[in-house]
Amino acid sequence: CGSVLAVNPSLAANLPILGTIFQKVEKGVIYSGEYKDAKKITQEKENHLSAQSQGIKLTASEVYCDGFSVYVTMKMQAEQMDFSKEGNRICVKTQYSFGKQMSKEDSDILMDGKCVDKHTFIGMMKFDKEDVIKKDGTLRIRILTVYLQDKEQSICGSWNFEIPYTVYKKGSREIAVNKKLNSHLAVKSVFVSPYQIVVFTKESGGVHSQIALFDQNGEKISKKLVRKKVHGSRKFMQGEGV
């Protein structure tokens, strides 16, 4: 099976920033950095940029694509709810697709940001593709559930979005490796952007490996966050610096 491992290097000092939501949350989110090249989402499809259900209004504001992930900022508003107790992250259950057909697979995605007033939360969401994104396109998102108070409260509804994105290739590159590390693990390629490092691997069936990444000085990139998806074998690691 194939595997994807993504690491976020905190390179904020070296990165290219737009105002509004990205500027307000970029230093505190998991995939930190400066999003100057983020694009205000055009109003051509205004009806697909805002959705309301169960008393919660969600509005997409900006989008940025580094070549592997699409980062979208959202504003969550609800007059009858208090977001001040939610900390810096709200989890939502989503289905999303980079093609015309919506995926039927549910994914828990974090809205990473902050509460700006009692009834308004702003944050950034990160959507990953299975491989490197080579062309501009449209990300389709369906939010099914909003989880509050550490998933103690679930609000089910339907919030649908169509987000056009542009691939920014500056500072991003894919490096072919094609190296077998041992009898059951090979590294196919590595994708590097200002926001993350993605390692594409191939593992033989039934065997799972632990992977460590090192910078150019031989220093190990530390891990803060690990997420695993066993079939399709996706692993994500959060790094503190390279």
Name each model feature, range by range.
Residues 5-242:
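Alpha-helical, hydrophobic structural elements that either
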